């Protein structure tokens, strides 16, 4: 049994609250245990210069963390005047993952900006951001369709992400909190579609190597968690695949 009394294959308590912020076209607060992220989706009727005249849209993301989202205060990146490599990596990951499940031509020449702001961090902030961002994006696209701005549904599948890892004492674990992530011998972030296809895997043997058998176990565990997350998403968005 883990410190928070979860079983090895059990998600933290997942809550997705829609309409958390008034102004964005899509907005949610996603909570994964003590990790909480506000995910907003904003629509602009223009695309980056490299896509002008191409007849397709774009999806991009920004990610940030409040100074006291963590146990010790961190300096705002805006105060430093530059974005850290970690932040840049996560931003690109979120945008890349969302684009994998959207037909950009059906979106038309518009951009969906995803803003993920971590207000409390206890591990899994990037995976929670992706899971919440998909819901925020879907709500924004549903609004576009309701207004008649687009006729066809550009979303091709659901999308969610989760962390898995290997602990020297407890073995395989699903949905690591900060303490578990810090002590894990192996940790991995897995992004998958509703059809069970992989979008991205980020895995590292921090303190130990791992076998093919263990890798398969991690992926099976991640797939189980992602199926559960997608059911949570559907409770907010309804069925979005036509």
Swiss-Prot record:
SUPFAM superfamilies: Ribonuclease PH domain 2-like, Ribosomal protein S5 domain 2-like
Residues given in the record as phosphate binding sites: 86, 124-126
Family annotation (InterPro entries): ExoRNase_PH_dom1, ExoRNase_PH_dom2, ExoRNase_PH_dom2_sf, PNPase/RNase_PH_dom_sf, Ribosomal_Su5_D2-typ_SF, RNase_PH, RNase_PH_bac-type, RNase_PH_CS
Keywords from the named record: Nucleotidyltransferase, RNA-binding, rRNA processing, Transferase, tRNA processing, tRNA-binding
GO biological process, one term: rRNA catabolic process
PANTHER family named in the record: EXOSOME COMPLEX COMPONENT, EXOSOME COMPLEX COMPONENT RRP41
Protein name as it appears in the record: Ribonuclease PH
Gene label: rph
């Amino acid at each position: 049994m883990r410190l928070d009394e979860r079983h090895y294959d059990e998600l933290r308590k997942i809550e997705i609250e829609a309409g958390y912020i008034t102004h964005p076209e899509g907005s949610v607060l996603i909570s994964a245990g003590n990790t909480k992220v506000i995910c907003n989706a904003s629509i602009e009727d223009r695309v980056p210069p490299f896509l002008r005249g191409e007849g397709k849209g774009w999806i991009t993301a920004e990610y940030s963390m409040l100074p006291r989202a963590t146990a010790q205060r961190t300096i705002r990146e805006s105060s430093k005047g530059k974005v850290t490599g970690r932040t840049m990596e996560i931003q690109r990951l979120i945008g890349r993952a969302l684009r994998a499940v959207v037909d950009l031509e059906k979106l038309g020449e518009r951009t969906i900006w995803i803003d993920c702001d971590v207000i409390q961090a206890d591990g899994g902030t990037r995976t929670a951001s992706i899971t919440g961002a998909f819901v925020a994006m879907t709500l924004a696209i549903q609004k576009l369709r309701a207004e008649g701005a687009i006729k066809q549904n550009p979303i091709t599948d659901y999308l969610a992400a989760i962390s898995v890892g290997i602990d020297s004492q407890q073995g395989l674990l699903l949905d690591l909190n900060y303490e578990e992530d810090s002590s894990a011998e192996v940790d991995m972030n897995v992004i998958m579609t509703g059809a069970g296809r992989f979008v991205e895997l980020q895995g590292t043997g921090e303190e130990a190597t791992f076998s093919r058998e263990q890798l398969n176990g991690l992926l099976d565990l991640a797939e189980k968690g992602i199926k559960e997350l997608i059911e949570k998403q559907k409770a907010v968005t309804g069925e979005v695949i036509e």
